[in-house]
From Swiss-Prot:
Belongs to the CDC123 family. It comes from Kluyveromyces lactis (strain ATCC 8585 / CBS 2359 / DSM 70799 / NBRC 1267 / NRRL Y-1140 / WM37) (Yeast). Its main location: cytoplasm. Residues 79-98 have a biased composition (Acidic residues). This is Translation initiation factor eIF2 assembly protein. ATP-dependent protein-folding chaperone for the eIF2 complex. Binds to the gamma subunit of the eIF2 complex which allows the subunit to assemble with the alpha and beta subunits. Keywords: ATP-binding, Chaperone, Cytoplasm, Magnesium, Metal-binding, Nucleotide-binding. Transmembrane segments: none annotated. The lineage of its organism: Eukaryota, Fungi, Dikarya, Ascomycota, Saccharomycotina.
């Protein structure tokens, strides 16, 4: 029997210096003219980093926003947030002093990092609304936790909720250097973490693109929002020309790395290119409509334009969903997790529904 042919997995090497070069503050000043306005807060106090890592979200009592009801959300064993466990703990007076002493101190914004809290509030006051990120990642996977279902933050508590609920942010804090061939256990300890607050502006997701640059050449361009938009295909030459001009004339002459991944935005009337982010040339970066094997191994035709890949037909299973929808939950569940009374009411309703289902099941079996 003939052996099945297969494409061997291509080794993609990334070094810790590559990761550091893609940290927002490392490149923002070089491309400030082409990047949405932002404020970088660094260094971040150790208490704030512990706050992001703790099991629960303690919101600020200073924020006059009734949406959050000024209390603590606790993370349960399923990595979901509620205050149910917090209430149970509060009613339990049997904890010994030793148990209490063994618990880590809970970080509270206005107690443990009041200066940072006020600085964030000042930036929001200046910009009106912001969208946050750390060195590399934005909490795109946690937008479900805000009432507007976007990363648009109107107050400090919005930022605390997004950052605490995001797996992307947790990855930045704990695993940013995991794929580096020269990884050192001290890398995460030595990095200076930063909070980036970008001025909010509405982006048409259809006009965001991911650009793969290898050895100072564009090897591929992918639509970033994986839904079908019928007006994109006739414009693909316009998109390619804009991106080529931006990468070769602006980015490559001013950026230290020769292999990296850009996120860009092409606003109408398609006369300019905005730089949104720079990501490492690494398998940890989503290849979207490409695969990392083909990006790392395919030959480049120097006489041809870079390949741009778009969604060219309706994928109904994908089109009716939103990015990161696997992280989202019904609005009544979110509201219940923020309000103790709503949580009790919702839990009561669930129990009643379960009893009815069990009763129906018993009657059917009889």
């Amino acid at each position: 029997m003939a052996a099945e042919s297969y494409t061997p997995l291509v080794d993609i090497k990334v070094r810790s210096d590559d990761i550091r070069a893609c940290s927002f503050s490392s490149w923002y000043d070089k491309f400030k003219k082409y990047t949405p306005k932002a404020k970088i807060i660094q260094p971040l106090p150790e208490e704030f980093l512990r706050y992001l890592a703790q099991d629960g979200i303690r919101l600020s009592l200073e924020e006059n926003d009734s949406t959050y009801n000024d209390h603590c959300l606790k993370r349960d064993d399923d990595n979901e947030y509620s205050d149910w466990e917090a209430d149970d703990d509060g009613d339990n007076d049997s904890d010994s002093d030793d148990d209490k002493n063994g618990k880590e101190e809970e970080m509270v914004p206005m107690v443990n990092f009041p200066d940072l809290h006020r600085e964030i509030a000042e930036v929001i006051g200046e910009y009106g609304a912001v969208t946050p990120k750390l060195n590399w990642s934005a909490p795109r996977d946690a937008t479900w936790i805000l009432p507007n279902n976007t990363s648009k933050c109107m107050n400090v508590n919005d930022i605390y909720l997004l950052l605490n609920a995001s797996n992307y942010i947790a990855y930045d804090l704990d695993h940013a250097f995991d794929e580096c061939e020269d990884r050192d256990n001290s890398d995460n300890q030595s990095i200076q973490f930063e909070l980036v607050l970008r001025k909010w502006f509405d982006i048409n997701p259809a006009l965001e693109f991911r650009v793969f640059v290898r050895d100072s050449e564009i090897w591929g361009i992918s639509q970033r929002d994986l839904n079908y938009y019928n007006y994109l295909e006739p414009l693909q030459d316009t998109f390619t020309n804009l991106i080529e001009e931006f990468v070769y004339d602006i980015v490559l002459p001013n950026f230290d790395l020769k292999s990296f991944v850009l996120d860009v935005y092409l606003p109408r009337p398609f006369e300019s290119c905005w730089l949104i982010d720079i990501n490492p040339w690494s398998r940890t970066t989503d290849p979207l409509l490409f695969s990392w094997n083909e990006l790392a191994s395919k030959d480049l035709d120097s006489d041809a334009s870079p390949e741009i890949r778009l969604i060219t037909e309706h994928n109904m299973g994908r089109f009716v969903t939103k990015e990161h929808s696997e992280n989202q939950v019904p609005k009544d569940v979110v509201q219940a997790s923020l309000d103790p009374e709503s949580m009790r009411e919702l839990t009561y309703k669930w129990k009643e529904i379960l009893k009815m289902q069990e009763a129906e099941s018993d009657s059917d079996s009889n």
